[in-house]
């Protein structure tokens, strides 16, 4: 059977000809405006959602802390993900919205740059850390919260073009 992912595949840009990890050389790429949007969910009991919305939590402002953690995380992505390029970020916005139907919170991050490579990992890191921080801030109320559906919602700009996956 033929290997569907040969080590020298052009699709595996983070591997060299010997299959060793490498940081992709983007020095010949043109700087363009690039944006990525990612989302995550934190599912919780209705009582936990109500307590967070009312501000009745032992650690303080859950949502403000989670939002700031997400922004800070986007800026640290290259320090967390080994082969990510450090990028100048022009915009990082983290929105945390209550969703009584879940019940819990929807988290959405939008990250924008003018650079040689995209910001998908920065957006995904932002929602992941915002969700983890929300969990940390509210775990005294409920330890059974679930972080779910971390996904890339869209990516625009760059050589590979725009990406809009189908809704889950």
From Swiss-Prot:
Which superkingdom, per the lineage?
A: Bacteria
Cite the GO molecular-function annotations of the record: cyclic pyranopterin monophosphate synthase activity
Q: Which CDD domains match?
A: MoaC_PE (cd01420)
The keyword Lyase is assigned to this record: yes
For this UniProt record, the keywords arranged alphabetically read as follows: Lyase, Molybdenum cofactor biosynthesis
Sites where the protein binds substrate: 83-85, 121-122
What biological-process GO terms show up in the record? Answer: Mo-molybdopterin cofactor biosynthetic process
Reported EC number(s) for this entry are: 4.6.1.17
- Give the reaction(s) catalysed: (8S)-3',8-cyclo-7,8-dihydroguanosine 5'-triphosphate = cyclic pyranopterin phosphate + diphosphate
Question: Member of which family?
Answer: Belongs to the MoaC family.
* Subunit relationships: Homohexamer; trimer of dimers.
Any idea what this protein is called?
A: Cyclic pyranopterin monophosphate synthase
Organism field: Trichormus variabilis (strain ATCC 29413 / PCC 7937)
| Underlying gene | moaC
């Amino acid at each position: 059977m033929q290997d569907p992912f040969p080590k020298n595949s052009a699709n595996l840009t983070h591997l060299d000809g010997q299959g060793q990890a490498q940081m992709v050389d983007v020095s010949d790429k043109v700087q363009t405006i690039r944006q990525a949007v990612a989302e995550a969910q934190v599912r919780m009991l209705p009582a936990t959602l109500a307590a967070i919305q009312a501000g009745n939590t032992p650690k303080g402002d859950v949502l403000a802390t989670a939002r700031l953690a997400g922004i800070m995380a986007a800026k640290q992505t290259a320090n967390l993900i080994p082969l990510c390029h450090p990028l100048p970020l022009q915009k990082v916005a983290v929105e945390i919205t209550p969703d009584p139907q879940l019940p819990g919170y929807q988290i959405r991050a939008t990250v924008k740059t003018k650079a040689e490579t995209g910001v998908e990992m920065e957006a995904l890191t932002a929602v992941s850390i915002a969700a983890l921080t929300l969990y940390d801030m509210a775990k005294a109320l409920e330890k059974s919260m679930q972080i779910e559906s971390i996904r890339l919602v869209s990516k625009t700009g760059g050589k590979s073009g725009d990406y809009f996956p189908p809704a889950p």
